Regions:
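A nucleotide-sugar donor-handling region in carbohydrate enzymes
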Residues: 132-201
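Donor nucleotide-activated moiety binding/catalytic core segment of transferases
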Residues: 76-80, 227-262
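Catalytic donor nucleotide-activated moiety binding site of glycosyltransferases and closely related
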Residues: 50-63, 105, 187-192, 209-241
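A donor-sugar binding/catalytic signature common to diverse glycosyltransferases
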Residues: 91-102, 112, 245-285
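Catalytic binding pocket for nucleotide-activated donors in carbohydrate/polymer assembly enzymes
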Residues: 268-313
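A conserved, positively charged/aromatic
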Residues: 111-114, 120-136, 249
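Conserved donor-nucleotide binding/catalytic region of nucleotide-linked donor-dependent transferases
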Residues: 312-328
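Conserved nucleotide-sugar phosphate-binding/catalytic loop shared by glycosyltransferases and other
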Residues: 10, 27-72
Length: 335
């Protein structure tokens, strides 16, 4: 049966970027697309900025506890089921658990897309992978017992939207916020509120304060955060249109974060990054970016000594920054 309509399910802002070019390509082929989302950070704003129609099946986040998560999945299953009965798509694709459940119920193929190893996201492995018709993941990922139903590719999700064929950094966009000719650093603090983030530590206030003090003599500091900040950090906070963040990231001297996605985005853009959280050493695609291609550093929250050794090496080090740009070009050409 020919595919005439595809339903794309988004559960994270990065998934908007992942699918935006795919969406355009499908439309150019005459295939109709629809978006289903749930509340997550700036996801809804990204679709609004691009004037893309969507249906939000979970306008308010339901909390992070087990009961809240169970109720959230049930609600999303029910609402997506009703939507599919009305819309009648030929294919469902995305990164959310509910597409696999509903796909089975309404007999519509569901393709799950991701980049985390299955042992890092055990809930997805238990609740989504068994019902998915196909899993599409980078070849570096550990897929465990789902290896046989996985279609792999030798690349990273981030290159679907940050490859030079799709993205060119523009200093004019950065100038809307500040002068990009003056050295600057980006700090990104994540909420770490996803189900697989339970018990995970990232950048704490004390470490953030010390990082700011260390970097201040070397350039401007701009901070973006998913969580509430202490008053002393507010003067560093900057509000950036979500659609512009990759331009800002591309010209930065360094990204320091506890976010997996933004670290990988910096890596493929050639911006050195320091990723500090308890996932360090556990996620294959980030291990590859950090250890094989040496585009960034993964540092455990407890290893403050190494953090400041790396900061000393990178801050103001134009050679390191230019080397990253060169390595990134070679990595991209490989893919």
């Amino acid at each position: 049966m020919a595919v005439k309509k595809v339903l794309i399910s988004l559960g994270h802002p990065a998934h908007f970027h992942l699918f935006k070019n795919i969406n355009a390509n499908l439309n150019n082929l005459g295939i109709e697309t629809e978006f289903i989302i749930r509340e997550k950070d700036v996801l809804e704003n990204l679709l609004k900025n691009e004037d893309l129609a969507y249906y939000n099946i979970l306008p308010k986040e339901k909390g992070s506890g087990f009961l809240a998560l169970t109720w959230s999945i049930l609600l999303r299953d029910i609402r997506l089921f009703k939507f599919c009965l009305r819309s009648k798509p030929d294919l469902i694709v995305g990164s959310t658990v509910e597409i696999t459940h509903v796909g089975k119920l309404v007999n519509i193929p569901a393709i799950s897309v991701g980049e985390d190893d299955m042992d890092v996201v055990p809930l997805f492995s238990r609740l989504a992978a068994p019902f998915s018709d196909c899993l599409v993941f980078p070849s570096i990922c550990r897929m465990g017992k789902w290896t046989k139903k996985t279609l792999t590719y030798n690349s990273y999700q981030e290159l679907a939207y940050l490859h030079p064929n799709h993205f060119r950094p523009d200093k004019k966009i950065v100038r809307k916020y500040f002068n990009p000719d003056y050295p600057y650093f980006i700090l990104r603090l994540s909420a770490l509120s996803a189900h697989h983030d339970k018990g995970i530590k990232g950048l704490d206030e004390e470490t953030t304060n010390k990082i700011i003090s260390f970097l201040a003599p070397h350039g401007a500091i701009y901070l973006t955060s998913e969580k509430k900040l202490q008053p002393e950090f507010e003067r560093y906070r900057i509000s950036i249109n979500p659609i512009d963040i990759h331009h800002v990231l591309a010209y930065s001297q360094l990204l320091i974060c506890d976010s997996q996605t933004m670290a990988a985005e910096a890596g493929v853009l050639g911006t050195p990054f320091i990723r500090m959280n308890d996932f360090v050493g556990k996620i294959s695609y980030l291990n590859e970016l950090e250890d094989i291609y040496q585009l960034g550093y993964g540092i455990a929250p407890s290893d403050k000594t190494r953090l400041f050794d790396v900061l000393t090496h990178i801050a103001g080090n134009r050679t390191k920054i230019e080397k990253n740009r060169l390595i990134t070009c070679k990595v991209i050409n490989k893919f």
